[in-house]
From Swiss-Prot:
It is found in: Cytoplasm; Nucleus. It comes from the Eukaryota. This is Peptidyl-prolyl cis-trans isomerase FKBP5. It comes from Mus musculus. Its EC number is 5.2.1.8. It catalyses: [protein]-peptidylproline (omega=180) = [protein]-peptidylproline (omega=0). Disulfide bonds: none annotated. Residues 440-456 have a biased composition (Basic and acidic residues). SMART domains: TPR. Residues 1-20 have a biased composition (Polar residues).
């Protein structure tokens, strides 16, 4: 469907055809963006606001001169739809396309580069012609781990988002395997959705939503109901879920700067207890949310009285130690080490902090550091039998690791030696072949000379 020239087969400029036949797809109906479908798409689904879209395109000025082409670069162009990453005409035009569709767009300056133009290729107030092929699109990966994919059906209002602790009113519909298992309006506190049988992925997504936004969320098991599943809803362990969520309204929780020290200490006691309840119930991600609140409120709090300072330090120490335990359970060992470091910064001889950091380092195969921490535990409490066992574990694991490395390197060197021997043998064989060929050639030449002499 693409050509290198800006004219059609009969020599007609496509911009002229667009002006006559193009559909006005602007909301204002000001003919700022005209569209003609050149090839119908392969599905009925169109990309949504925020989707990552992949296109091939060719751009021309209104006189037919090509100024850009992804085909020339042999690489599709990708952008997030509706985020202002491309000219307005593209956000408008691509949102109307279906996967596999090829269309032509004619874009007036106010929907393109306006009076500024672009670099030296596009002059001021230029009307542009594009041929675009929509190759693919996919939802926004909210946390860049493929755990929560969002597709926005209706863009929200304003720029404000709920924060952790905000009270939200939402409508949600949950589906699994094509079956709707939950459909209701519900009011809850962000970070405490578990209390209302709402998976943690919804809590985390809500802090990225705006009022009246309607979106589809695809949740992986980690952000859904996890290994436990949800028998109440008939959800099996490690099931993937789909939710359609509408954020009807929300009231933000107080930010740290809006609270005085007394209020922060009061709230710290409350969320510490909530975190403990979640932890005991195996809801480690939810527990992390609660313990992190304590850190956000108190870590940078200054000008406290002696009594407030002691209370603050006690809450922070407990929060860091509990966060470390949560991260150990979640297998996020680097974060566990960081939290232990923070705890030990408050109390360098803290037995739990040293032990948990040792555990995390052992699980990261840093045997020497782990052994060092467990030895420090014994220095603090010589009766800690678990630390003694862990030291033995570190020594055994280090020995096994070194033995495994020795075998790997021995096999590696053996392979290198065998390869070198083959190369030497090959070279020697080649040399003999060359010498043999040279000898035969010399012998042949001598025979020819003998024949010549005999003939004479």
């Amino acid at each position: 469907m693409t050509t290198d020239e800006g004219t059609s087969n009969n020599g007609e400029n496509p911009a002229a055809t667009m002006t006559e036949q193009g559909e006005d797809i602007t909301t204002k109906k000001d003919r700022g963006v005209l569209k003609i479908v050149k090839r119908v798409g392969t599905s009925d689904e169109a990309p949504m606001f925020g989707d990552k879209v992949y296109v091939h395109y060719k751009g021309m000025l209104s006189d037919g001169k090509k100024f850009d082409s992804s085909h020339d670069r042999k690489k599709p162009f990708a952008f997030s739809l509706g985020q202002g990453q491309v000219i307005k005409a593209w956000d408008i035009g691509v949102s109307t396309m279906k996967k596999g569709e090829i269309c032509h767009l004619l874009c007036k300056p106010e929907y393109a580069y306006g009076s500024a133009g672009h670099l030296q290729k596009i002059p001021s107030n230029a009307t542009l012609f594009f041929e675009i092929e929509l190759l693919d699109f996919k939802g926004e990966d909210l946390f860049e781990d493929s755990g929560v994919i969002r597709r926005i059906k209706r863009k929200g209002e304003g720029y404000s988002n709920p924060n952790e602790g905000a009270t939200v009113k939402v409508h949600l519909e949950g589906c699994c395997g094509g079956r709707t298992f939950d459909c209701r309006d519900v009011v809850f506190v962000v970070g405490e959705g578990e209390d209302h049988d709402i998976p943690i992925g919804i809590d985390k997504a809500l802090v990225k939503m705006q009022r009246e936004e309607q979106c589809i969320l695809y949740l992986g098991p980690r952000y859904g109901f996890g290994e436990a599943g949800k028998p109440k809803f008939g959800i099996d362990p490690n099931a993937e879920l789909m939710y359609e969520v509408t954020l009807k309204s929300f009231e933000k929780a107080k930010e740290s700067w809006e609270m005085d020290t007394k209020e922060k200490l009061t709230q710290a006691a409350i969320v510490k207890e909530k975190g403990t309840v979640y932890f005991k119930g195996g809801k480690y991600t939810q527990a992390v949310i609660q313990y992190r609140k304590i850190v956000s409120w108190l870590e940078m709090e200054y000008g406290l009285s002696e009594k407030e300072s002691k209370a603050s330090e006690s809450f922070l120490l407990a929060a860091f130690l509990n966060l470390a335990m949560c991260y150990l359970k979640l297998r996020e060992y680097n974060k566990a080490v960081e939290c232990c470091d923070k705890a030990l910064g408050l109390d360098s001889a803290n037995e739990k902090g040293l032990y948990r950091r040792g555990e995390a380092q052992l699980l990261m195969n840093d045997f020497e550091s782990a052994k060092g921490d467990f030895e420090k535990v014994l220095a603090v409490n010589p009766q800690n039998r678990a630390a003694r066992l862990q030291i033995s574990m570190c020594q055994r694991k280090a020995k096994e690791h070194n033995e495994r490395d020795r075998r790997v390197y021995a096999n590696m060197f053996k392979k290198f030696a065998e390869r070198d021997a083959k190369e030497e043998a090959s070279k020697a064989g080649s040399k003999k072949a060359v010498e043999g060929a040279a000898g035969k050639q010399h012998e042949s030449q001598a025979m020819e000379e003998g024949k010549a002499k005999g003939h004479v």
